[in-house]
Amino acid sequence: LATESLFEEIFAQIADACSQLGVSVAGGHSEVTTGLDRPLVIGQMLGEVNSNEVIRSSGLLPGDALLLTKGLAIEATSIVAREMPDTLRGKGWSDRDLAEAANYLTQPGISVVEDARIAQAAGEIHALHDPTEGGVATALVEIATASGVDLDIDADTLPISLLSQRLCDDVGIDPFGAISSGALLIGCTAGTTRTIVDALATRGIVAAQIGTVRSGRVEGRSSEVRLRRDNSWEALPQFSVDEIARLFTE
């Protein structure tokens, strides 16, 4: 049920998050509507940026390194822990593990603001892209297509927490195609990779180089993303729907 205290809690969270980023909350409207059994929040953020400082998802260059922060299936971990606790308990999960997984929304968190700021200050960044629905696999296709390049990705270097891997194994989803809000793909000059990874590490953010930009796109064909696994190359797996959506509709 909608209560005054619930409204106050939601708007206090919005105000706190905006305050941390120096963002002003302008306007707002709230109402109680039949047919909804939970709060629904919609927002839009507007801002200005120096045109010389804009970093797009379309800026990858041949020879660039591609980094990934935090890891695969961050938001998926929290969603499954919150929505399927009994299923996970049946797989031997403790209440402590469930609470930790559910808290992935805040730790490691689904914001990439700090990741982007640190990376931009530490090295020469050409492209940024945040994986969401469809996971990191889909995001790789998106950033390659936007930039008009081909990518080589090393499956063995893709970061994923032990808790996320365990959860995905237990419910039968592929973390590569599961919603990964909180992760950030960073395209950078190869020589600045270590500097960026180390700068992120000082703030407690895990990052790893997961691949390289192989070449510019050849006219007449789409961008290619290939995956190296066990010293052999294979096509990147494709996910027509997010693994979370598949899980909940089966």
Model-predicted segments: where are they?
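Acidic, Ser/Thr/Pro-rich beta/coil linker or hinge segments at domain junctions
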Residues: 201-250
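General beta-strand structural signal in soluble alpha/beta enzymes
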Residues: 24-28, 67-70, 127-131, 153-155, ...
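Solvent-exposed alpha-helices and their adjacent loops that cap or buttress functional pockets
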Residues: 18, 32-38, 57-61, 86, ...
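Active-site-proximal betaalpha loop/short-helix elements
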Residues: 103-180
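Helix N-cap motif at beta-to-alpha junctions
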Residues: 188-193
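Glycine-rich anion-binding loops of enzyme active sites
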Residues: 1-87, 212
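Active-site glycine-rich loop that binds ribose-phosphate moieties when present
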Residues: 44-56, 99-117
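A short beta-alpha structural unit
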Residues: 181-187
